[in-house]
Every structure is written in C-alpha cells, then in structure tokens.
Amino acid sequence: LLARFLAGAGNGNIAVAKAYIGDISTRAELPGRMGMIGASFGLGFMIGPMIGGILTDPATSFGGPFDTQWWSDHPYFLPCLFAALLSLSSMILAIWLLPESLPPNARVKEKTDLKNVGKKLTNLSSITIMPLSIRKLVYTNSVFLLAFTMMHATFILYTAMPIVDGGLGYDERTNGYIFAYVGLVGVIVQGGLIRKLSEKFEVASLMLVGIALTALGLGSIPYPSPTPLIVLLVMTLIAAGNGLFQPSQSTLLTHESRVHGLDLGGVMGVQEGFGALSRIIGPVLAALIWSETVDGIGLWTYHTVFRVAGLVAIFALGLNYLPNSKIEKEGRHHD
C-alpha cells in the first residue's frame, strides 16, 4: 500500500507534462503534440508489461545467477527494481533536458511551504467555480478513467481464469503481450493518426468517437471465445478509443483554459486530482462487482463488471451533450 501511495503521489508529473506541452504549443500544434506525449505513454504501456512479464520469476526464466532460493521466493522483485531504475532515469533526463517553459515574468512567485499544503489540497473544490465547459471536460475525463480502470483492474482476473470456467487461461507473459499490443495501437493512433485526423475533423468529435469506441470495446469483454483474433479486435477498439480520447480531451481542456484566462497547470492539476479519485474508485468498484458476480449465472456473471464499465463510458459520452449556459457561450464568442 505504501508503494502504491508513493507511485500515485508521483503521478503529479502527468499534469505538469501536459501543462508544459500547453505552454509551448500553439492551438494548431496542440493535437499533434498532445498525441505525441500520449504516444510516449502508449510506448511505455506497450514495452513495460512485456518487459515485466519477461523479467518475472527470473529463477525459472533465466536460471544461472538467479537460480537461487531468494529469487524463487521473490519472483516480482526484478521487474519492480527495473521499473524503479527507469523512473530514476526519467527524473535525471527531465532535470538535464527540459528548460523552464515560461519566461521569468510569467512565473508564479509563490513559495511552497507547509502553510500552503492545505491550500493546495483544497484545489479540487475550485472545480465548482470553473466555467461549465471546463467542468464538463474534467468530469468527462474522470468518468472515462473510472470505466477504463474498472476494466484494467479485472481484465487479468478474467484472462487468468481457466478456459473451462469461461476465461482465457493466459499466464503473465501472455497478458504482457496483450498489453504490448494495446500500447502499439495507442502509439499508432496518438503518434501519427491523431495529427492527421485533427486537420480534417473537429477535436471535440474525435474525443466523442474515442469514448464511443472504448465503450463498445469494454462492453464486448469477455469475448465469445478465446480466439486470439477476437481478443485483439476488442482490445483494438479499446486502445484506439483511448488513443483518440486522451490527446483530444487534453487539447480541448488546454484551449478552454486559455479562452477563460485560467492557469493551465492549475486546471491540469485539478483534472489529475479527479482522475486519481477515479483510479481509486474504479478498481475497488470493479473488484466488488467481480467478487459478487464471478460465480453467478444469467445476467450476473463474470461478464457483469465489463458491461458496467461499458455503461460508465457511455455515461461519460452523455456528459458532453449537457447544454452550456447562454452566458458562457456569449463570453467565449467575445473572447
């Protein structure tokens, strides 16, 4: 739990990275650059699980110096150690290669001390006074992540189930290959397609299509059979949907923040805060549904959690059809 807490605290770098891209990009450059940063996450998502699966249980996989009782008793230590070294390398690269994105006169002259911690922790409540367009985007992202993390928390439970019980009978390495494929699709969509698509279609439309594809994919789990082609088809829907959603939503949020004259880092921080709540609630909710339905029959079976995740994604889609106020539309027009 402590390790997960520290990892979650470190996720603040996501908001900073997106704000950095927003600071140095024009509106025309935003979709492509948000796509590139999303593609980098996708690349890690592609390679990471595969490496993790390969490094798991080195006593059995590699033998030699790892063929000891200690490595047999700690089969997951090597992938965790490798991940920690990668995180350290990332920090060093950020210090070495990234200059400050804002000129000195645009930087906030505020000291961060213990007196400001409470103020920073209450920033989530500032969502209530933000413009409706920004609130809708933040809530959409939060609900989308809720659906996505519900799937992510239970997908491996499903794939590890024996085939006779309705699962796929996959081991850690096979699951790693599946997630590597998901990452590959994400890299293709965010690293190349999103830039071209944003030149032909509205960014908001791309975001909505991404949510719809993800909802369809989530609702299609578990698959009718463990046939690899069907597995990859459904995961393609989810990966492509997420690949369209993430950069499009970040682009829209950046644009709306600029239109309303809001601090981009603060807005991104609020969004990541709500996203963190979704990442907490999603796995807990999914585990509860899974435990209550996995041995059921009829409508209440191991299918249920994935169907619920799909419905949650549809709810995220519906949030975007709530009307903006007339005052806000007029204000945006004048801006």
PLM features per residue range, with description:
Residues P99-T140, M161, D165-G167, D335:
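Juxtamembrane intracellular "pre-TM" segments in multi-pass secondary transporters
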